[in-house]
């Protein structure tokens, strides 16, 4: 089983600022969220055989808190958050109009200049998911620690029939989805009881 998690809260999350490639650490609430996720997995007898993470510290630390020293964390740039370019660090209350239009109606509003496109996000996350599929199909549990938009990119790749439904869905800090595998193919991702805030 694959479990994909969004990192714990950072100060930029708390302040409602766009946080893409900036390398901000978890705040106290984020550390507590990751500890709660660790308990969630421990209570269900989940022991991770492989752990992948975005190289950004908030994702790595989330994974580290969850697995401790029981597994090596493999970082992969394809798990990075969307590159917001010149919009990095801007307020989401409210966001710039062009950013709001993009996130509310990405079909008719392409990514603002300098910002990574959703197609690019889905492409790199899809490439990553296909690369780990053979090993994942052998069994065992895998943890992927990443970011909200990157996580949505993976979920969109795995469920193309969703019609973009995941883009408008809120994914909270340390929210977890599980992805099963059958006959060498991914199953539809499912929400778990580990809901983010």
Predicted regions span which residues?
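Short, active-site-adjacent cap segments at secondary-structure transitions
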Residues: 11, 58-60, 81-82, 142, ...
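Glycine-rich phosphate-binding loop signature in dinucleotide/nucleotide-binding domains
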Residues: 44-47, 132-141
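Domain-level recognition of soluble alpha/beta enzyme cores
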Residues: 162-188
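Short beta-strand scaffold positions
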Residues: 53-54, 123, 145-146
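Generic beta-sheet signal
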Residues: 2, 140-149
